[in-house]
């Protein structure tokens, strides 16, 4: 990312942490989607550096995956004076607030794959071994990581879509959680009275803790 910043002549203090908002957009509404996210970044006083269209090779995709492929973008952002821990906390709060606003706008189909200064999600409707064939970033020697989480299994009780692909933001999981509905109900019941010395008043902004419209694996990821 710093190499791209230099190419684009965008100034950035290298002592400040960089974050990446990884998104799937409806190809018909890319500009509106970016505008919504940029406005929310301003509300949170998060410095936006640039948007990059993630380089991909759609030729490796099957017919269904190619026809349903979203526009894949990454928003590159920067910490200001926050510590790395506080910046990550701010990004979580930003994402939860943004997702609530997205849910209120019917015509915008936006999925936030990840929003973090520590991890970035690359996923889609293809096998694990095709990941680097589709995402050119993962063949770039400038990209380095301490670990990677891969997920090979396709959904069995829901139709496969790009946003349902794994890994999620924290984990990859095979699902089939038999107690998912009761787990969700207990979390929802406790959510009303939940308090936190870490989140303080901001705890209201990260509710609901669990999105009941997604898969059981996705709900587990919400909880983590």
Stretches with model-predicted labels:
Residues 1-224:
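Conserved short alpha-helical segments that host acidic/polar catalytic motifs at enzyme active sites
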């Amino acid at each position: 990312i710093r190499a791209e910043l230099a190419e684009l002549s965008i100034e950035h203090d290298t002592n400040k942490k960089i974050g990446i908002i990884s998104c799937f957009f409806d190809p018909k509404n890319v500009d509106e989607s970016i505008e919504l996210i940029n406005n929310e970044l301003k509300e949170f006083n998060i410095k936006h550096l640039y948007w990059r269209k993630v380089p991909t090779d759609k030729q490796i995709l099957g017919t269904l995956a190619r026809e349903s492929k979203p526009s894949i973008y990454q928003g590159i952002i920067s910490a200001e004076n926050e510590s790395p821990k506080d910046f990550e906390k701010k990004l979580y709060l930003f994402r939860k607030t943004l997702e609530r606003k997205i849910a209120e706008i019917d015509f915008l189909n936006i999925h936030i794959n990840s929003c973090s200064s520590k991890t970035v999600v690359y996923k889609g409707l293809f096998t694990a071994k095709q990941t680097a064939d589709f995402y050119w970033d993962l063949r770039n020697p400038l990209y380095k990581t301490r670990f990677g989480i891969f997920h090979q299994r396709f959904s069995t009780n829901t139709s496969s879509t790009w946003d349902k692909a794994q890994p999620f933001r924290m984990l990859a999981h095979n699902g089939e959680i038999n107690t998912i509905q009761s787990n969700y109900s207990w979390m929802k019941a406790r959510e009303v009275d939940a308090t936190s010395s870490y989140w303080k008043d901001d705890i209201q902004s990260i509710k609901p803790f669990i999105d009941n419209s997604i898969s059981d694996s996705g709900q587990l990821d919400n909880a983590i």
